Amino acid sequence: MLKPEGLVVFSKRACPTCALIEPVMQRVAKAVPAFQVVSQDDPKFPSGVANLVDDRELDHSWLNNIESTPTLIRYQSGREAERVVGWDRDGWRRLTGIPDLGDGLPAFRPG
């Protein structure tokens, strides 16, 4: 069950961009209490993240119109307020409020 407030990232281990940003997802999980990862192919990816949702059946992905991973969504009052598709460092920084998130990574990678 997805939380109606906070940040949710849709991810999968088989996605090269998701693998690239695994440390980013781990950092967000530590810094943002209302953060969940919905994993499309491995319920243990990314490692070290407590709030993981197993979406191997893709039910949550379908309901949220996810076309590629990673997709980061900010929910407010139970509704989608904003989304970033792929790794967009500025977009992820804006949604998470972490100003140095992804330092050392490329500025953009498609999902």
Language-model features and meaning:
Residues V32-E57:
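Thiol-based oxidoreductase modules, predominantly thioredoxin-like and allied folds used
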Residues M25-Q26, D42-P43, W62-L63:
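Short, flexible, glycine/charge-rich loop motifs used to bind or transfer phosphoryl groups or to couple energy/partner
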Residues E22-M25, N51, W87-D88:
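Short, glycine/charged-enriched secondary-structure capping and boundary segments
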Residues L63, E67-R109:
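Non-catalytic, surface beta->alpha helical segment in thiol-disulfide oxidoreductase systems
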Residues L2-M25, A34-Q36:
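Short active-site neighborhood of thiol/selenol oxidoreductases, capturing the structured segment around
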Residues V28-K30:
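Short, acidic, metal-binding catalytic loop of nucleotide-sugar glycosyltransferases
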